[in-house]
Amino acid sequence: STKGKVVESKTDNTGSYNFKLDPLLSYEILVSNEGYLNKKLTETTVGIDENKVFVVDFVMDPVKKEIILPKIEYDFAKWDLRAKSIADLDMLAEALKDNPNVVIELKSHTDYVGNDRSNQRLSQKRADACVKYLVSIGIDPAQLVAVGVGEKEPFVIENKDGRFKEGDVLTESYIRKIKFKKNREKAHQYNRRTSFKVLREDYVPNTDEK
């Protein structure tokens, strides 16, 4: 809190937690659990003049799962970040600040339009652009590894979406068999993605003054 007081609370077997908040204070709530990335949110009682129950729910990301950043999009054959892509990268930056001991791989994928070599180069430039932005807002470059894989890793559908079933692998041959153009384009959109996953959890930040 803004008093500098630290309050620890463990969840019960349903994942619920509770503690009393003092008036006229702002709180920073940090949650952690083995196998998941730390997550932080803020809440405040400043300006609250009556009793109130605050409900603060957390959705935690598993360390071992590859996380897709859905808002990161690019113009065709470009690697410049669109304005709305910045929001996802800003959220990723906050996650890295909450988890200073992790090193992540930031991976960019393309669709099957164009040839393999150009798609590989394009995806690497896109991954590099994401890393460059994160470094520009204060993330330690040693926490970031940029990888462009081109079209080598087709997306696997996780949840049924119209004609796409859970487990469908969106390979080039699969997409060619799709009858309707709008569904083919949707498959390409699934393949065009940027994601990250945790490589290490033992990084020690360099705190030496330069």
Language model: regions and residue ranges:
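Extracellular beta-sheet/turn segments enriched in Thr/Pro/Gly and aliphatic residues
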Residues: 39-72
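Short strand-edge motifs at loop-to-beta-strand transitions and within beta-strands
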Residues: 15-19, 54-56
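A short, solvent-exposed beta-strand micro-motif common in secreted/extracellular proteins
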Residues: 15, 23-36
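Short, conserved beta-strand segments of beta-strand-rich sandwich/propeller modules, principally
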Residues: 26-30, 103, 131
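Periplasmic OmpA-like peptidoglycan-binding domain that tethers envelope proteins to the cell wall
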Residues: 109-210
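Short, solvent-exposed beta-strand/turn patches at coil↔beta or beta↔helix junctions
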Residues: 62-102, 110-118, 182-201, 205-207
